[in-house]
Swiss-Prot record:
Domain of life from the UniProt record: Bacteria
InterPro entries: Aerotolerance_reg_N, UPF0353, UPF0353/GerABKA_families, VWF_A, vWFA_dom_sf
Mode of membrane association: Multi-pass membrane protein
All copies of domain VWFA, residue ranges: 98-298
Transmembrane segment boundaries: 18-38, 67-87, 309-329
Identification of the protein by name: UPF0353 protein MUL_1490
SMART domains (alphabetical): VWA
Length: 335
């Protein structure tokens, strides 16, 4: 929970929970206050002449006189929570990660069911994704059809990726499995040289395609897409798949209309086997939306951050309120 002016306030993930022992001190102070109030009442009742007492103190103490003490005790409780060091989830930009953008450039990408065609729309959306991805992430690019080619090794130079995207060319057949294996090899290579940690950097493959794998025809083949997806999971590299297009796409090949419907099921299976997520998009706007979602997932990591300042600020406000209440109600600070 985040409150205006106060900041994040949680009651979980305490870094120094032993500070809650201070609540015993607060409880002791409350007990002393109650005992003093009872003793005060007993002293007042010792007056033998009640009429004289009422003439001397005609106004009975206000029932609100305990509010300052209550606020003071509450402020001590709030300060105790702050000292215990609560934490909350904080999203911070990644500065050590690898993302391989793997794009299908097979002939089916000529289909115009997405204006102006699937390839051009894919290029524009991918360039926007590259621009908006967290600057510290190493982004690589692979184009694949019958074979897979690393066009850009993972780098933080976004201009190199965008320039390569502009040069994508169509080719025959679709070897999705080979593309995934090639991406895994590129990730392993760059992971061996990237410093900044005792373990390889986190990595992800973003696979963009519109149709079924044709080389090999069986995705469970040793070089098939499903086999590659299982290998990716074993290496801790999830695959986010994007199936792009509509069921009504077609291309003209040798003056014949060839249907090229989008294949969502294969892409979903690849994502599932790798431990990643699958997306589908039928328009450029939907594709951009998918890339924005991926950018939020890939570009940031969640860590536990300090949430004590909110409790400190609230405790200070309550303490000030206790002092003001004492001056207004009892005409003195609480004792």
């Amino acid at each position: 929970m985040t409150l205006p002016l106060l900041g994040p306030m949680t009651l979980s993930g305490f870094a120094h929970s032993w500070f809650f022992l201070f609540l015993l001190v607060v409880a002791g102070l409350i007990a002393i206050y109650v005992v003093l109030q009872l003793a005060r009442q007993k002293r007042m009742l010792r007056f033998a002449n009640m009429e004289l007492l009422e003439s001397v103190a005609p106004q009975r103490p206000s029932r609100y006189r305990h509010i300052p003490a209550m606020l003071l005790a509450l402020s001590l409780v709030l300060f105790t929570v702050a000292m215990a060091g609560p934490t909350h989830d904080v999203r911070i930009p990644r500065n050590r990660a690898v993302v391989m953008l793997v794009i299908d450039v097979s002939q089916s990408m000529r289909a115009t069911d997405v204006e102006p065609n699937r390839m051009v729309a894919a290029q524009e959306a991918a360039k926007q994704f590259a621009d908006e991805l967290t600057p510290g992430i190493n982004l690589g690019l692979i184009a694949y059809a019958g074979t897979a080619t690393v066009l850009v090794s993972p780098t933080t130079n976004r201009e190199a990726t965008k320039a390569a995207l502009d040069k994508l060319q169509f080719a025959d057949r679709t070897a999705t499995g080979e593309a995934i294996f090639t991406a895994l090899q590129a990730i392993a290579t760059v992971g061996a040289v990237i410093g900044g940690g005792d373990t390889p950097p986190p990595a992800r493959i973003v696979l963009f395609s519109d149709g079924k794998e044709t080389m090999p025809t069986n995705p469970d083949n040793p070089k098939g897409a499903y086999t590659a997806a299982r290998t990716a999971k074993d290496q801790g590299v999830p695959i986010s798949t994007i199936s792009f297009g509509t069921p009504y796409g077609f291309v003209e090949i040798n003056d014949q209309r060839q249907p090229v419907p989008v294949d969502d099921e294969t892409m979903k299976k690849v994502a599932q086997l790798s431990g990643g997520n699958s997306y589908n998009a039928a328009t450029l706007a939907e594709l951009n939306s998918v890339y924005v979602s991926l950018q939020q997932q890939i570009g940031y990591e969640t860590i536990r951050g300090d949430a004590s300042m909110g409790w400190l600020r609230l405790g200070a406000l309550v303490l000030v309120a206790a002092a003001l209440a004492a001056l207004l109600i009892n005409r003195r600070l609480p004792t």
